C-alpha cells in the first residue's frame, strides 16, 4: 500500500487514469474536482472521502481558482499503482464534455 499528501495549484489536474486495486482520496484543503468516466465533474471539500473502484477511469485536480491538497491511498498490483491515459481536455475540465 502507498499513500501521499499531494497538492495541486489552481488549474492543475491529473490525466485520465485507473488504479488496478482502486484508490481512496481524502480531501484536506481547498476544493477538488473529480470526474469518473461518463459522469459529471463533482466538487469535493475538506473532510470528504472519494473512493474509486479497481479499474475505474477517472481524473482529479484543483479548481481554476483554488489550490487543493488531498491524501491519495492506493495498493500495488504486480508492482504497479496507476495506469496513465490521455490528458483531460479543457472542455472536460470545465464540465462541458
Spans of features found by a protein language model:
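A generic "binding-loop/recognition-motif" signal
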Residues: 12, 20-21, 40, 56, ...
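Short acidic-glycine-tyrosine-enriched beta hairpin
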Residues: 38-55
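Short beta-strand His + acidic residue motifs that chelate non-heme Fe in jelly-roll/DSBH
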Residues: 14-16, 34-35, 52, 57-63
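Double-stranded beta-helix
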Residues: 59-97
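Glycine- and acidic-residue-biased ligand/ion/polar-headgroup-sensing regions
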Residues: 19-38
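A short glycine-rich, His/Asp/Glu-containing loop-to-beta-strand
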Residues: 1-15
Amino acid at each position: 500500500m502507498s499513500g501521499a499528501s499531494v497538492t495541486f495549484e489552481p488549474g492543475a489536474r491529473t490525466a485520465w487514469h485507473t488504479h488496478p486495486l482502486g484508490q481512496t482520496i481524502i480531501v484536506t484543503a481547498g476544493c477538488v474536482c473529480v470526474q469518473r468516466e461518463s459522469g459529471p465533474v463533482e466538487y469535493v471539500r475538506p473532510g470528504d472521502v472519494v473512493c474509486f473502484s479497481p479499474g475505474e477511469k477517472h481524473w482529479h485536480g484543483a479548481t481554476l481558482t483554488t489550490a487543493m491538497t488531498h491524501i491519495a491511498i492506493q495498493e500495488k498490483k504486480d508492482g504497479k499503482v496507476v495506469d496513465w491515459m490521455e490528458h483531460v481536455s479543457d472542455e472536460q475540465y470545465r464540465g462541458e464534455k
